[in-house]
Swiss-Prot record:
<dbReference type="GO" id="GO:0036382">
    <property type="term" value="F:flavin reductase (NADH) activity"/>
</dbReference>
<keyword id="KW-0560">Oxidoreductase</keyword>
<dbReference type="GO" id="GO:0042602">
    <property type="term" value="F:riboflavin reductase (NADPH) activity"/>
</dbReference>
<comment type="pathway">
    <text>Aromatic compound metabolism; 4-hydroxyphenylacetate degradation; pyruvate and succinate semialdehyde from 4-hydroxyphenylacetate: step 1/7.</text>
</comment>
<dbReference type="GO" id="GO:0009056">
    <property type="term" value="P:catabolic process"/>
</dbReference>
<dbReference type="InterPro" id="IPR012349">
    <property type="entry name" value="Split_barrel_FMN-bd"/>
</dbReference>
<dbReference type="Pfam" id="PF01613">
    <property type="entry name" value="Flavin_Reduct"/>
</dbReference>
<keyword id="KW-0285">Flavoprotein</keyword>
<dbReference type="InterPro" id="IPR036390">
    <property type="entry name" value="WH_DNA-bd_sf"/>
</dbReference>
<protein>
    <recommendedName>
        <fullName>p-hydroxyphenylacetate 3-hydroxylase, reductase component</fullName>
        <ecNumber>1.5.1.36</ecNumber>
    </recommendedName>
</protein>
<comment type="function">
    <text>Reductase component of a two-component system that supplies reduced FMN (FMNH2) to the oxygenase component to catalyze the hydroxylation of 4-hydroxyphenylacetic acid, leading to the production of 3,4-dihydroxyphenylacetate (3,4-DHPA). Catalyzes the reduction of free flavins (FMN, FAD and riboflavin) by NADH. Subsequently, the reduced flavins diffuse to the oxygenase component C2.</text>
</comment>
<comment type="similarity">
    <text>Belongs to the non-flavoprotein flavin reductase family.</text>
</comment>
<comment type="subunit">
    <text>Homodimer. The p-hydroxyphenylacetate 3-hydroxylase (HpaH) is composed of an oxygenase component C2 and a reductase component C1.</text>
</comment>
<dbReference type="GO" id="GO:0010181">
    <property type="term" value="F:FMN binding"/>
</dbReference>
<dbReference type="InterPro" id="IPR036388">
    <property type="entry name" value="WH-like_DNA-bd_sf"/>
</dbReference>
<keyword id="KW-0520">NAD</keyword>
<keyword id="KW-0058">Aromatic hydrocarbons catabolism</keyword>
Length: 315
Protein backbone atom coordinates (compact mmCIF):
# COMPACT_ATOMS: atom_id res chain seq x y z
CA UNK A 1 0.00 0.00 0.00
CA UNK A 2 1.33 3.42 -0.96
CA UNK A 3 1.64 5.80 1.91
CA UNK A 4 0.15 9.20 1.24
CA UNK A 5 2.50 12.05 1.93
CA UNK A 6 0.87 14.99 3.62
CA UNK A 7 2.37 18.42 3.91
CA UNK A 8 1.27 21.36 5.94
CA UNK A 9 1.08 24.39 3.73
CA UNK A 10 1.49 27.59 5.67
CA UNK A 11 -1.05 30.22 4.77
CA UNK A 12 0.36 33.51 3.63
CA UNK A 13 -0.20 36.23 6.19
CA UNK A 14 -2.37 38.95 4.68
CA UNK A 15 -1.56 42.52 5.66
CA UNK A 16 -5.02 44.10 6.25
CA UNK A 17 -3.85 47.57 5.18
CA UNK A 18 -2.23 46.32 1.97
CA UNK A 19 -5.26 44.13 1.26
CA UNK A 20 -7.58 47.10 1.63
CA UNK A 21 -5.40 49.22 -0.64
CA UNK A 22 -5.45 46.49 -3.29
CA UNK A 23 -9.25 46.30 -3.07
CA UNK A 24 -9.29 50.06 -3.65
CA UNK A 25 -8.37 49.43 -7.29
CA UNK A 26 -11.90 48.13 -7.82
CA UNK A 27 -14.03 51.20 -8.50
CA UNK A 28 -17.43 51.18 -6.80
CA UNK A 29 -20.43 53.38 -6.35
CA UNK A 30 -21.19 54.99 -2.98
CA UNK A 31 -24.35 54.27 -1.00
CA UNK A 32 -25.95 55.25 2.27
CA UNK A 33 -27.79 52.35 3.88
CA UNK A 34 -30.73 53.40 6.05
CA UNK A 35 -33.20 51.71 8.38
CA UNK A 36 -35.65 52.49 11.16
CA UNK A 37 -37.01 50.26 13.92
CA UNK A 38 -40.64 50.06 15.00
CA UNK A 39 -39.73 52.18 18.02
CA UNK A 40 -38.39 54.96 15.79
CA UNK A 41 -34.63 54.41 16.10
CA UNK A 42 -33.10 55.57 12.84
CA UNK A 43 -29.72 54.74 11.33
CA UNK A 44 -27.69 55.59 8.23
CA UNK A 45 -24.20 54.46 7.22
CA UNK A 46 -22.07 55.14 4.15
CA UNK A 47 -21.08 51.92 2.38
CA UNK A 48 -19.49 50.86 -0.91
CA UNK A 49 -20.00 47.11 -0.42
CA UNK A 50 -23.40 47.13 -2.16
CA UNK A 51 -23.96 44.56 -4.91
CA UNK A 52 -26.71 42.75 -6.77
CA UNK A 53 -27.38 39.07 -6.07
CA UNK A 54 -30.37 37.89 -8.08
CA UNK A 55 -32.96 39.15 -10.57
CA UNK A 56 -35.64 36.61 -9.67
CA UNK A 57 -36.24 37.15 -6.87
CA UNK A 58 -34.77 40.65 -6.86
CA UNK A 59 -32.03 40.41 -4.23
CA UNK A 60 -29.20 42.75 -3.24
CA UNK A 61 -26.56 42.66 -0.51
CA UNK A 62 -24.13 44.78 1.44
CA UNK A 63 -21.88 44.18 4.44
CA UNK A 64 -21.35 45.89 7.79
CA UNK A 65 -18.54 45.54 10.32
CA UNK A 66 -19.47 43.35 13.28
CA UNK A 67 -18.11 46.07 15.57
CA UNK A 68 -20.47 48.69 14.16
CA UNK A 69 -22.92 50.09 16.68
CA UNK A 70 -25.38 50.58 13.80
CA UNK A 71 -25.73 46.85 13.14
CA UNK A 72 -28.24 46.36 15.97
CA UNK A 73 -30.80 48.58 14.24
CA UNK A 74 -30.33 46.92 10.83
CA UNK A 75 -30.79 43.55 12.53
CA UNK A 76 -33.96 44.66 14.31
CA UNK A 77 -35.57 46.59 11.43
CA UNK A 78 -37.71 44.65 8.97
CA UNK A 79 -36.58 46.76 6.00
CA UNK A 80 -33.59 48.81 4.86
CA UNK A 81 -33.00 51.39 2.16
CA UNK A 82 -30.20 51.62 -0.38
CA UNK A 83 -29.53 55.23 -1.40
CA UNK A 84 -27.14 55.29 -4.37
CA UNK A 85 -25.49 58.70 -4.18
CA UNK A 86 -25.15 61.05 -7.13
CA UNK A 87 -21.93 62.86 -8.02
CA UNK A 88 -23.21 65.99 -6.22
CA UNK A 89 -23.61 64.26 -2.83
CA UNK A 90 -20.05 64.06 -1.49
CA UNK A 91 -21.00 66.07 1.61
CA UNK A 92 -23.87 63.68 2.35
CA UNK A 93 -21.51 60.72 2.00
CA UNK A 94 -19.01 62.30 4.40
CA UNK A 95 -21.74 63.16 6.90
CA UNK A 96 -22.93 59.55 7.20
CA UNK A 97 -19.38 58.19 7.26
CA UNK A 98 -18.71 60.07 10.50
CA UNK A 99 -19.93 59.31 13.99
CA UNK A 100 -22.62 61.75 15.04
CA UNK A 101 -25.48 61.89 17.51
CA UNK A 102 -28.01 62.76 14.81
CA UNK A 103 -26.78 62.36 11.25
CA UNK A 104 -30.28 63.09 9.92
CA UNK A 105 -30.51 66.58 11.45
CA UNK A 106 -31.44 69.20 8.81
CA UNK A 107 -31.39 66.56 6.04
CA UNK A 108 -34.42 66.25 3.74
CA UNK A 109 -35.69 62.72 3.20
CA UNK A 110 -38.86 60.77 2.52
CA UNK A 111 -40.02 57.59 4.24
CA UNK A 112 -40.33 54.35 2.27
CA UNK A 113 -41.53 50.86 3.13
CA UNK A 114 -40.93 50.10 6.80
CA UNK A 115 -40.30 53.83 7.40
CA UNK A 116 -36.84 53.63 5.81
CA UNK A 117 -35.30 57.08 5.10
CA UNK A 118 -34.88 57.80 1.38
CA UNK A 119 -32.76 60.80 0.44
CA UNK A 120 -33.59 63.26 -2.30
CA UNK A 121 -31.48 63.80 -5.45
CA UNK A 122 -29.86 60.34 -5.44
CA UNK A 123 -28.97 58.41 -8.60
CA UNK A 124 -31.28 55.59 -7.54
CA UNK A 125 -32.85 54.08 -4.42
CA UNK A 126 -33.96 50.59 -3.45
CA UNK A 127 -36.49 49.75 -0.75
CA UNK A 128 -35.66 46.31 0.63
CA UNK A 129 -37.22 43.77 2.95
CA UNK A 130 -34.60 42.04 5.07
CA UNK A 131 -34.17 38.60 3.47
CA UNK A 132 -31.23 37.05 5.33
CA UNK A 133 -28.12 37.87 7.34
CA UNK A 134 -25.01 35.77 6.74
CA UNK A 135 -21.75 35.78 8.67
CA UNK A 136 -18.72 36.71 6.58
CA UNK A 137 -15.51 36.93 8.59
CA UNK A 138 -15.43 40.19 10.53
CA UNK A 139 -18.56 41.47 8.73
CA UNK A 140 -22.25 40.64 8.57
CA UNK A 141 -23.58 40.26 5.03
CA UNK A 142 -27.10 41.67 4.88
CA UNK A 143 -29.25 40.40 2.01
CA UNK A 144 -32.43 42.23 1.04
CA UNK A 145 -35.35 41.51 -1.27
CA UNK A 146 -36.17 44.59 -3.33
CA UNK A 147 -39.85 45.49 -3.01
CA UNK A 148 -39.64 48.87 -4.72
CA UNK A 149 -36.99 50.93 -6.53
CA UNK A 150 -36.53 54.43 -7.92
CA UNK A 151 -34.35 55.10 -10.99
CA UNK A 152 -33.52 58.82 -11.11
CA UNK A 153 -30.73 58.49 -13.68
CA UNK A 154 -28.37 61.03 -12.12
CA UNK A 155 -24.63 60.62 -12.65
CA UNK A 156 -23.32 58.50 -9.73
CA UNK A 157 -20.63 59.25 -7.19
CA UNK A 158 -17.74 56.80 -7.54
CA UNK A 159 -15.06 55.63 -5.13
CA UNK A 160 -11.61 54.56 -6.39
CA UNK A 161 -8.21 54.25 -4.70
CA UNK A 162 -9.44 55.94 -1.54
CA UNK A 163 -10.86 59.01 -3.26
CA UNK A 164 -14.13 60.15 -4.77
CA UNK A 165 -14.36 60.06 -8.54
CA UNK A 166 -16.89 60.72 -11.28
CA UNK A 167 -17.95 58.91 -14.44
CA UNK A 168 -16.15 59.91 -17.64
CA UNK A 169 -16.42 58.24 -21.06
CA UNK A 170 -13.62 55.77 -21.82
CA UNK A 171 -11.02 57.16 -24.28
CA UNK A 172 -11.45 54.14 -26.57
CA UNK A 173 -15.00 55.21 -27.33
CA UNK A 174 -14.92 56.98 -30.68
CA UNK A 175 -17.62 59.61 -30.79
CA UNK A 176 -16.88 60.34 -34.46
CA UNK A 177 -18.36 57.16 -35.88
CA UNK A 178 -20.08 57.30 -39.24
CA UNK A 179 -23.54 57.09 -37.69
CA UNK A 180 -22.75 59.80 -35.16
CA UNK A 181 -21.15 62.36 -37.47
CA UNK A 182 -24.43 63.69 -38.77
CA UNK A 183 -26.10 63.83 -35.36
CA UNK A 184 -23.80 64.79 -32.46
CA UNK A 185 -21.33 67.52 -33.55
CA UNK A 186 -23.99 70.19 -34.01
CA UNK A 187 -25.36 69.64 -30.51
CA UNK A 188 -22.90 67.98 -28.14
CA UNK A 189 -19.84 69.74 -29.53
CA UNK A 190 -21.43 73.10 -28.75
CA UNK A 191 -22.40 72.03 -25.23
CA UNK A 192 -20.01 73.44 -22.61
CA UNK A 193 -20.64 70.72 -20.02
CA UNK A 194 -19.96 67.96 -22.55
CA UNK A 195 -16.79 69.67 -23.75
CA UNK A 196 -15.52 70.19 -20.19
CA UNK A 197 -16.02 66.53 -19.22
CA UNK A 198 -14.34 65.37 -22.43
CA UNK A 199 -11.44 67.76 -21.81
CA UNK A 200 -10.98 66.41 -18.26
CA UNK A 201 -11.07 62.84 -19.57
CA UNK A 202 -8.47 63.59 -22.24
CA UNK A 203 -6.22 65.39 -19.74
CA UNK A 204 -6.45 62.65 -17.08
CA UNK A 205 -5.85 59.88 -19.59
CA UNK A 206 -2.19 60.90 -19.98
CA UNK A 207 -1.60 62.63 -16.64
CA UNK A 208 -2.72 60.04 -14.08
CA UNK A 209 -0.27 57.31 -15.18
CA UNK A 210 2.58 59.81 -14.67
CA UNK A 211 1.34 60.64 -11.18
CA UNK A 212 0.88 56.97 -10.21
CA UNK A 213 4.39 56.23 -11.47
CA UNK A 214 5.69 58.44 -8.65
CA UNK A 215 4.75 55.69 -6.19
CA UNK A 216 1.91 57.61 -4.56
CA UNK A 217 -1.70 56.58 -4.85
CA UNK A 218 -4.27 59.17 -5.90
CA UNK A 219 -5.40 59.86 -2.32
CA UNK A 220 -1.82 60.28 -1.04
CA UNK A 221 -0.73 62.51 -3.93
CA UNK A 222 -3.83 64.66 -3.56
CA UNK A 223 -3.12 65.18 0.15
CA UNK A 224 0.51 66.10 -0.46
CA UNK A 225 -0.39 68.67 -3.12
CA UNK A 226 -3.17 70.28 -1.06
CA UNK A 227 -1.09 70.44 2.13
CA UNK A 228 1.89 71.93 0.29
CA UNK A 229 -0.31 74.60 -1.28
CA UNK A 230 -1.65 75.53 2.20
CA UNK A 231 -5.18 76.03 0.84
CA UNK A 232 -6.55 74.06 3.81
CA UNK A 233 -5.93 75.69 7.19
CA UNK A 234 -7.66 72.98 9.24
CA UNK A 235 -8.61 69.30 9.06
CA UNK A 236 -12.19 70.36 8.30
CA UNK A 237 -11.03 72.49 5.35
CA UNK A 238 -8.80 69.65 4.19
CA UNK A 239 -11.75 67.32 3.72
CA UNK A 240 -13.39 69.85 1.41
CA UNK A 241 -10.23 70.52 -0.61
CA UNK A 242 -9.24 66.89 -1.27
CA UNK A 243 -12.83 65.60 -1.78
CA UNK A 244 -12.20 62.40 0.16
CA UNK A 245 -14.02 60.70 3.06
CA UNK A 246 -12.61 61.25 6.55
CA UNK A 247 -11.74 57.56 6.81
CA UNK A 248 -9.57 57.71 3.69
CA UNK A 249 -7.95 60.97 4.78
CA UNK A 250 -7.04 59.32 8.08
CA UNK A 251 -5.68 56.23 6.29
CA UNK A 252 -3.67 58.25 3.76
CA UNK A 253 -2.29 60.57 6.46
CA UNK A 254 -1.29 57.53 8.51
CA UNK A 255 0.65 56.12 5.55
CA UNK A 256 2.29 59.48 4.83
CA UNK A 257 3.13 59.87 8.52
CA UNK A 258 4.74 56.42 8.64
CA UNK A 259 6.85 57.44 5.65
CA UNK A 260 8.01 60.52 7.54
CA UNK A 261 6.25 62.91 5.16
CA UNK A 262 3.62 64.37 7.46
CA UNK A 263 3.11 65.45 11.09
CA UNK A 264 -0.26 65.64 12.89
CA UNK A 265 -0.34 68.83 14.97
CA UNK A 266 -3.83 68.24 16.35
CA UNK A 267 -5.87 70.85 14.48
CA UNK A 268 -4.04 70.47 11.19
CA UNK A 269 -1.47 68.41 9.30
CA UNK A 270 1.97 69.73 8.41
CA UNK A 271 4.39 68.37 5.82
CA UNK A 272 7.94 67.53 6.85
CA UNK A 273 10.92 68.64 4.78
CA UNK A 274 10.81 65.28 3.00
CA UNK A 275 7.05 65.65 2.52
CA UNK A 276 7.48 69.06 0.91
CA UNK A 277 10.13 67.59 -1.39
CA UNK A 278 7.70 64.86 -2.49
CA UNK A 279 4.95 67.42 -3.06
CA UNK A 280 7.40 69.52 -5.10
CA UNK A 281 8.18 66.44 -7.21
CA UNK A 282 4.45 65.86 -7.81
CA UNK A 283 4.02 69.51 -8.80
CA UNK A 284 6.87 69.13 -11.30
CA UNK A 285 5.01 66.19 -12.85
CA UNK A 286 1.79 68.23 -12.99
CA UNK A 287 3.50 71.33 -14.38
CA UNK A 288 5.40 69.34 -16.99
CA UNK A 289 2.21 67.73 -18.24
CA UNK A 290 0.41 71.07 -18.19
CA UNK A 291 3.18 72.65 -20.26
CA UNK A 292 3.04 69.75 -22.71
CA UNK A 293 -0.73 70.05 -23.18
CA UNK A 294 -0.93 73.85 -23.38
CA UNK A 295 2.30 74.53 -25.30
CA UNK A 296 0.39 75.47 -28.46
CA UNK A 297 -1.55 78.25 -26.72
CA UNK A 298 -0.31 81.79 -26.08
CA UNK A 299 0.28 83.19 -22.60
CA UNK A 300 -2.82 85.37 -22.91
CA UNK A 301 -4.95 82.41 -24.01
CA UNK A 302 -3.78 80.36 -21.03
CA UNK A 303 -4.45 83.24 -18.64
CA UNK A 304 -7.96 83.71 -20.04
CA UNK A 305 -8.66 79.97 -19.77
CA UNK A 306 -7.50 79.87 -16.13
CA UNK A 307 -9.60 82.89 -15.26
CA UNK A 308 -12.67 81.31 -16.83
CA UNK A 309 -12.13 78.08 -14.87
CA UNK A 310 -11.63 79.98 -11.59
CA UNK A 311 -14.78 81.97 -12.26
CA UNK A 312 -16.78 78.77 -12.87
CA UNK A 313 -15.40 77.21 -9.68
CA UNK A 314 -16.03 80.37 -7.68
CA UNK A 315 -12.49 81.15 -6.53
Amino acid sequence: MNQLNTAIVEKEVIDPMAFRRALGNFATGVTIMTAQTSSGERVGVTANSFNSVSLDPALVLWSIDKKSSSYRIFEEATHFGVNILSAAQIELSNRFARRSEDKFANIEFDLGVGNIPLFKNCSAAFECERYNIVEGGDHWIIIGRVVKFHDHGRSPLLYHQGAYSAVLPHPSLNMKSETAEGVFPGRLYDNMYYLLTQAVRAYQNDYQPKQLASGFRTSEARLLLVLESKTASSKCDLQREVAMPIREIEEATKILSEKGLLIDNGQHYELTEQGNACAHMLYKIAESHQEEVFAKYTVDERKLFKNMLKDLIGI
